[in-house]
Amino acid sequence: FRISPTSFYQINHQQTEKLYKKAIQLADISKNDTVIDAYCGIGTIGIVASKKAGKVIGVELNSEAVSDAKINASINNIKNVTFVNADAGDFLVEYAKNAKADVVIMDPPRSGSTPEFLNSLLKIKPDRIVYISCGPDTQARDIKMLVKGGYKVTACQPFDLFPHTEHV
């Protein structure tokens, strides 16, 4: 994978691989599924998901990361992924007007997602949502909103990407 200096990438490769494997397993993706990879960074989760999905749309605000994601899809010969340079909340508000997704994998920053994103997520009603977070407090806040919208938590799996530190 290509990673530019301003792009985000998990530095603990061994744990990241386990995290992505579990996320894809929990997403239960099939060849007919449309998957949104929100807050996609350099596209790693979406590229991994693309091997099982019909179509993947990665959304990321950092334009350099989107450039990396497109290159990463190309060098991995992935054809069923599209990357969009946009705020995930703004993108989902527009997307919810005309389209549906079967699966949304979201990996927002430590500050969590936005009410606009979460409300739009509730409008498109994906069958499955996988929420990856490094901020348990903001994840709990966001999940509370999703639960109020009709979703239920079926699994929770911690991964220690920063061993021997206070970071989750």
Residue ranges and their predicted role:
Residues 1-168:
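Rossmann-like S-adenosyl-L-methionine
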